[in-house]
Amino acid sequence: MELKKLLECLTFYNVNGEVENCEITSLEMDSRKITSGSAFVCITGFTVDGHDYVDQAVKNGASAIFTSKPLMKEYGVPIIQVEDTNRALAMLAVKYYDYPTKHFPLIGVTGTNGKTTVTYLLDKIFEYHQKKAGVIGTIQVKIGEETFPIVNTTPNALELQKTFHVMREKDVKQGIMEVSSHALDMGRVYGCDYDIAVFTNLSQDHLDYHQDIQDYLRAKSLLFAQLGNGYDSEKEKYAIINDDDSSSHLLKRSTAQHVITYSCKKEATIMAKDIELTASGIRFKLHSPLGNITIQSRLMGMFNVYNMLAASAAAIASKVPLNVIQQALESIEGVNGRFEPIVEGQNYSVIVDFAHTPDSLENVLQTIKDFAKRNVYVVVGCGGDRDRKKRPLMAEVALNYADHAVFTSDNPRTEDPQAILDDMTAELDANSGSYEVVVDRKEGIAKAIQSAQKDDIVLIAGKGHETYQIIGHTKYDFDDRDVARNAIKQKGE
């Protein structure tokens, strides 16, 4: 694409150099990936500043450089200065890949907990509706039956638009994606033409990045504020909002589009009534403007009633018939790393779950306590280089519900694992409950499983689907499910 044409997507910028006859063959934010004809966009990250790598980019063949601050020397290629290269990158990527989300409807799901499950449920619903879906989520990118690994809940703007471009080429008819508060705040999803925005819930998380819970909510609300800012004003847009969450009033005010509410407690557009929670699943009646259906699901817990309501509301807004929604939801056996049972013939239960916030941990433990026959053990930690304020809260929740807690490492990253555990236990005393601290996660899981007797339940929380543990800057192979299976087998020997 000609640089001159690419620049049409930017409103304000300064150019130093000649843009005529400059052909751009790729967009890159990593100087190591630059080849002849690439445009290099300098992104200032948490630890690395792309402006420090302009020399390397030009040496590798960059044809143009996008910056957010003046450069100290000439490079012989056009230098385009913008106010914010993060937001500029998003718009450049959308333009370069020819506005891919114009070509299929897109659902964005945001909230502290439940995003992955809701996108999974929606994928299954559209599969039953015989509509090929592309999903971008915490676990993976899924296009039809193909899956690809993923690093962030929401990829950077460049990878995101590239993925949408691939979806378009593979004839995807419905896009579904998790949208993180980081991505919204950094402008990674600028230019994404959302048709439906879904809000699950809000509780404390990511306060290492956001100033406070209000700033976190503000970031989430951007998804709803951007509804209707797309390319086709004739298309109806919908905001799907959990009306039982205390933040719902602000999110309703954040959008000028149609609002669909869902609730388990009060009158709403979509409601769950006659809810039955058992050790084998969930049963409830879904009430909607299109009629009522009964859902019998193998998923567990009240939190999954909300997840199914959110997915159903988005599906109804997408014109999916109620009977298709019912069939799809009743077919689902579970979600990878979400309340996932580990069964090796043992006479006690082991469950792996991604719960890594105080609210999600409480939801899962409350569900377990509702059907537990004997003792409940929980293995849990907190991530390093992340919100320190939630650490004592995680320990408090664990001891409020479990008969015994094993506090252990999660992904310590660059922090001292023992220091993280000290933060978790700092406010505990002799009356707080039964717990032990085991720094090594493998040992912690093994200890809990060794302690379990007939009809006990062991919850291994925090990492869920993850197949790694981050220590320092290195990712090591580590899967809670595999570690649990091995511990169960060793106990039985």
UniProtKB/Swiss-Prot annotation:
GO terms for biological process: cell division; cell wall organization; peptidoglycan biosynthetic process; regulation of cell shape. Catalyzes the addition of meso-diaminopimelic acid to the nucleotide precursor UDP-N-acetylmuramoyl-L-alanyl-D-glutamate (UMAG) in the biosynthesis of bacterial cell-wall peptidoglycan. PANTHER family: MUR LIGASE FAMILY MEMBER, UDP-N-ACETYLMURAMOYL-L-ALANYL-D-GLUTAMATE--2,6-DIAMINOPIMELATE LIGASE MURE HOMOLOG, CHLOROPLASTIC. One of its GO terms (cellular component) is cytoplasm. The keyword Nucleotide-binding applies. Meso-2,6-diaminopimelate binds at residues 386, 410-413, 462, 466. The keyword NADP does not apply. This is UDP-N-acetylmuramoyl-L-alanyl-D-glutamate--2,6-diaminopimelate ligase. The lineage of its organism: Bacteria, Bacillati, Bacillota, Bacilli, Bacillales. The modification N6-carboxylysine is found at residue 220. GO terms for molecular function: ATP binding; magnesium ion binding; UDP-N-acetylmuramoylalanyl-D-glutamate-2,6-diaminopimelate ligase activity. The gene is murE1. It catalyses: UDP-N-acetyl-alpha-D-muramoyl-L-alanyl-D-glutamate + meso-2,6-diaminopimelate + ATP = UDP-N-acetyl-alpha-D-muramoyl-L-alanyl-gamma-D-glutamyl-meso-2,6-diaminopimelate + ADP + phosphate + H(+).
